[in-house]
Amino acid sequence: FALDARTGEQVWETEILDYKLNSATHSSGPIIADGLAISGRSCRPWGGPNACIMAAHNASTGEEVWRRRLIPAPGEPGDETWGDVPFESRHHVGSWMVPSYDPELGLIIMGTSVTSPAPKFYLGGTDNKHLYHNSTLALEVETGEIRWYYQHMNDHWDLDHPFERLLVETKVTPDPNEVTWINPDLTPGETRKVITGIPGKTGIVYTLDRATGEFLWATPTIEQNVVIDIDGATGEVTENPEIIFREAEQIVFVCPTWLGGKDWEAGAYSPLTNVMYYPLRNTCANMLATGNFESDTARALTEGGQGGLEIYQLAARHQLTPGTSNLGTVRAVSAETGKTEWLFETRA
């Protein structure tokens, strides 16, 4: 709905989804772009794939202009990445944080979340990519069509990637002494319009070309054992095979946990310093893939309020990252070089 800023009177109200049929929640507000109110949402598993949408409404009238489902249906691009999983059983790829907007390119830049359940052996196989979960999507502002996408990882652990994307124009000169993965075809020092920042719970900084989604560079900011490689030329991510769940009741040791790394707390960017600033956590967990939260193993892990996420079929016992006594950090990272300019650590 929209309110008159001068009087507080309601100007229009539009139903986007019937929560009884396509359950979803708004955990962040919309943005206004090109005269449109652009909104994302967290879609509940029981709401089905049609609840997992981004939508655009005329900001003056409330009329729907477009909606973009984030889970492909049969016959659509990306359908094959779900294998044999029926369309109605594809759940929970949400867009529950605030998007960014580039008016020159006419692009809405949005991040997406994990599937439900998270371990992919429950969803037709661990090798399937299950688009468009844990991805950066560039949508045409006028139509909602996907111009390009980049998938940050195939997520088995509820390590969402919906967080803020920073739109920056900067020289791109990643320092090989500081940055783990670099595109070998980069021209160092070239000024480019990029998307940068920490988009997901893994705490990895990604820098992509804004117009094309081309991978430029990426580097971790916390201890993590989830991503073991990124192909610099293609941007393709390799997850750690030793911690990918293969069966129910399997326990793996994962860093970070679904608490992050990074989580809801937003980072910031200063054009004066060309540096981004992020609050982060040093967390790990013994994590269990299970559909039975009454089992002895699940009870032992979650005892004392440690945590179980039934919609993801995960249970966990969280701990500090080995080798540190500080949970919290604030890290300042150069958008040009990827160098850590400074690091503040605190117990909480």
Predicted region positions:
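Asp-box/WD-like beta-propeller blade repeats and closely related beta-sheet repeat scaffolds
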Residues: 1-54, 60, 64-89, 94-96
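Aromatic (tryptophan-biased) beta-strands that constitute blades/sheets of beta-rich domains
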Residues: 9-18, 63-71, 76-89, 127, ...
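Glycine-rich, aromatic-lined ligand/substrate-binding cores of catalytic
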Residues: 162, 204, 263-306, 312, ...
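Beta-propeller blade signature
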Residues: 2-8, 51-64, 124-144, 205-213, ...
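Short, solvent-exposed loop/turn and secondary-structure capping segments
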Residues: 4-5, 15, 23-24, 42, ...
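Repeat-blade elements of multi-bladed beta-propeller folds
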Residues: 25-48, 53-54, 88-124, 130-135, ...
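ATP-dependent carbohydrate kinase catalytic cores
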Residues: 140-143, 152-172, 242-248
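Short, glycine-/Ser/Thr-/acidic-enriched flexible segments
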Residues: 44, 113-116, 143, 153-154, ...
